[in-house]
């Protein structure tokens, strides 16, 4: 008997890989001689890099970055054999990086995701596949853009602090430092 196991993560508890491994163990307990093919899948959030790297025989790159609240972390993105990078917003800007009491979308930033993109661009990737699921932020990518050299200014020309939707007074953008 052949069984295909294609599963996504269980938010906040198990990665797609953990889910497929658990189902495999359970199936083998019931049908010891079963042949199993596991395919972790993802919806663009957590597990997207793992799924694409596994399916396409890619590798992972670890990069110093910042979490949604600006704390230093190490985050990963994937490199595929065709020269593409796979980056999850969730890797550096995700809900799972925060304790429940820290979750504050109005002050969280996507700056860390921009750091991953910047690293990939500096290493000459040919294409970036960006998964947008699992974000802890509402900054509309302003933090991400900031990490790439774009500044956001208020009506008086002063640079705005990073953050979420509370920065609605943005009226102009500067791009002098863009890579």
Label the model's feature ranges:
Residues 25-97:
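Glycine-rich nucleotide/cofactor/substrate-binding loop typically near the N-terminus or early
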Residues 14, 18, 22, 43-47, ...:
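Conserved active-site and cofactor/substrate-binding residues in soluble primary-metabolism enzymes
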Residues 14, 65, 69, 77, ...:
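Solvent-exposed, flexible loop/coil residues
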